[in-house]
């Protein structure tokens, strides 16, 4: 339990930041899910568009500190490889 005024303020800030970061993470997951669904549908063009729209969201998450840059790079690399394989298949 926060007792001092400073710790009470910090608790309020933490609540706000948690809500914002949760929304950001959710938005990133939504974009990634759209790419996954596009890949599953087998349509290379839709998958490419979904990937192109997901990339800025991932990078924004990195900039805002929601996800680590290596995590974003790994996700983009794996999704790009799958979309590329879909296009060549």
Swiss-Prot record:
Disulfide bonds: none annotated. The keyword Acyltransferase does not apply. The keyword Electron transport does not apply. GO terms for molecular function: small ribosomal subunit rRNA binding; structural constituent of ribosome. Gene3D superfamilies: Ribosomal protein S20. GO terms for cellular component: small ribosomal subunit. Signal peptide: none annotated. GO terms for biological process: translation. Keywords: Ribonucleoprotein, Ribosomal protein, RNA-binding, rRNA-binding. Residues 1-25 are annotated as: Disordered. Pfam families: Ribosomal_S20p. Binds directly to 16S ribosomal RNA. PANTHER family: 30S RIBOSOMAL PROTEIN S20, SMALL RIBOSOMAL SUBUNIT PROTEIN BS20C. Belongs to the bacterial ribosomal protein bS20 family. This is Small ribosomal subunit protein bS20. It comes from Paracoccus denitrificans (strain Pd 1222).
